[in-house]
Amino acid sequence: MNVFWEHGYEATSTDDLLRAMGIGRQSMYDAFGDKHRLYLEALQLYETETGSELFGRVTRAPSPFVALCDYVLSVAEGSSLDLSRGCFYVNATTELAQSDPDVRAMVRASGARCVAAFEEILKEAKRRGEVDPSVDERVAANFLLNTISGLRVSAKAGVPPNDLRGIASLAISSLKPR
C-alpha cells in the first residue's frame, strides 16, 4: 500500500512493488493477479484502516459529534505533517478516477459510505443539540467529506498549517448551534 500511496499508480513499477513486498514476480501474480488488482486491494486496505480510525474515535468520545470534530481537526494537523503522501484516496481520485472505472467505482462507494457515516453522526448530534437545527445532515456530511479532501489537497500544495487548522475550525463551527 505504501509504495502506491507515496508514488502513485503510474510512477510505481512492478519491480518497486516486488522490492517492497520482498517477493518474486510470480508470487505477486499468483497472489494478486496483476499490478492493477494489487492497487485496488491497497485502496481497500487504506479505506479499512482510515474507517477504523474514525469508528474508534466515535466509540471512545463523549459524543459522536465531538469525535467527528476531533477527526476533522486531526486531518488538518495530519495533512500538514505528511505532505509527501497526502490522502491515498484523494491521490487515487486525482490520478485515476477519471480514466479507470474500477478506481472511480471504489472512490464513489467509499465516499458514499463516508457520507452515510457522517450523516448518522450529524443526526445524533442534532438530536443532542450539538448541531444547529437548520443544518441538513446530508448536505453537511458531503460538505465535511469535501472539506477533508480539500484540506488534504491544500496541504500537499503547501498551504500553511495554521490556514489548514483555520479551515477545519470554520467547517466545524458552521455546524454548531448559533
Region spans (language model):
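Short, basic, alpha-helical segments at the C-terminal edge of helix-turn-helix-like DNA-binding modules
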Residues: 44-50
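Amphipathic C-terminal alpha-helical segment
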Residues: 78-79, 124, 144-161, 174-178
